[in-house]
Every structure is written in structure tokens, then in C-alpha cells.
């Protein structure tokens, strides 16, 4: 799927990927939905999240927290309070540790609550997009607080691209779960 470059493409991609993710989740048995990941050596040495996330709750908690990053960043900067996208003290070289903090934060969150949270935060992100223009979303420099990127790029990353990431993990989980 090509990366969205218009508001409508962004909304469509985010919602389409979100629906696909829930269809994949709903196709799993309850036992599979609640089972711990068992990726073994299949993904050993790849991205840190393969070792960090233990189950689907962790994936949904992660998605929710990245929605919150986007929502807080946009709301703060739009109201005139200069705020970086990532939480302090993190930067793009150290944000992996921030993801570990998110993981730790949701260790006691039940799967059902994580599902409710990510569905609610997705809806909030979609509402946030409504009043924005194509220029605000996809023109570099239109919003000075987006730096050398665009707001739309951050939105794609926190929605459609992240849902694709979640589906990749879900598919790997289905494969390893079926092999057990």
C-alpha cells in the first residue's frame, strides 16, 4: 500500500488497516487471543519488540500509547505549548526504552481493557484529523513544530503503519500458536 499523501488517503488507510487488524484478531480463538507469544528463535536478533511484547495485550497497549503520543503532541502544539513528539528524555535514538516503559505500564492491563483503550484512542485520532487540512497534514513547514517532516507522516506512522506492524505480529503469533 502506498504511503498516504492526502487527508482522505490517510483517513482511508488508517481506518482500513484498523478494520483489517480487528478482522485478524476476531478470526482467532479466545485461547489464541489470550495466549503468550512463543516466537522462539524465529525472530531472535531482529527488532526489540519481538522479545519485548509477550502477548496481544502488549501490542494493543503499545498502539494506544503511540496514539496518546500523537494526540498530546498535536493538542499541545496547536494550543501554543511547544512539545516534542517523544516523551522526555527520549529521542529517536533512545525511544526503544520509552516503548519498554509503555510495556511496563500495561503489564497489569487486561486484554479487554487494552482493546477498549486502543479502539477509543483510534477514534480520538480520527476525530483529531477531521478539522485538519491537506496543507496542515502534508506540506512541509506548514506547521513549524513538525520540523523537517509533516504532521501527516506522524499520523500515518501512529495509525496505518503501526496497524500493519501489529498485524505482522498477529500473523506470526497465529503461525507459532498453530505449530504448538
Give a label for each model feature.
Residues 8-15, 60, 64, 112-115, ...:
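Short amphipathic alpha-helical segments with heptad-repeat character
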Residues 92-139:
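Acidic/histidine-rich alpha-helical segments that form the ligand environment
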Residues 27-46:
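Short secondary-structure junction/hinge motifs that connect adjacent elements
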Residues 18-29, 67-71, 75, 119-133, ...:
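Structural signal for well-ordered, non-membrane alpha-helices
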Residues 40-97, 136-180:
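Short, contiguous alpha-helical
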Residues 1-26:
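Extreme N-terminal tail/first-helix region
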Amino acid at each position: 500500500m502506498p504511503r498516504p499523501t492526502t487527508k482522505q488517503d490517510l483517513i482511508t488507510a488508517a481506518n482500513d488497516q484498523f478494520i483489517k487488524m480487528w478482522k485478524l484478531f476476531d478470526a482467532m480463538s479466545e485461547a489464541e487471543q489470550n495466549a503468550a507469544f512463543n516466537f522462539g528463535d524465529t525472530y531472535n536478533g531482529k527488532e526489540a519488540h519481538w522479545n519485548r511484547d509477550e502477548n496481544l495485550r502488549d501490542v494493543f497497549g503499545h498502539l494506544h500509547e503511540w496514539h496518546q503520543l500523537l494526540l498530546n503532541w498535536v493538542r499541545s502544539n496547536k494550543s501554543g505549548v511547544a512539545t516534542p513528539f517523544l516523551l522526555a528524555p527520549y529521542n529517536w535514538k533512545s525511544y526503544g526504552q520509552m516503548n519498554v516503559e509503555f510495556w511496563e505500564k500495561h503489564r497489569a492491563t487486561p486484554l479487554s481493557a487494552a482493546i477498549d483503550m486502543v479502539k477509543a484512542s483510534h477514534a480520538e485520532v480520527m476525530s483529531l484529523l477531521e478539522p485538519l487540512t491537506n496543507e496542515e497534514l502534508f506540506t512541509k513547514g506548514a506547521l513549524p513544530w513538525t520540523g523537517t517532516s509533516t504532521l501527516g507522516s506522524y499520523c500515518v506512522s501512529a495509525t496505518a503503519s503501526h496497524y500493519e506492524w501489529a498485524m505482522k505480529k498477529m500473523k506470526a503469533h497465529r503461525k507459532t500458536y498453530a505449530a504448538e
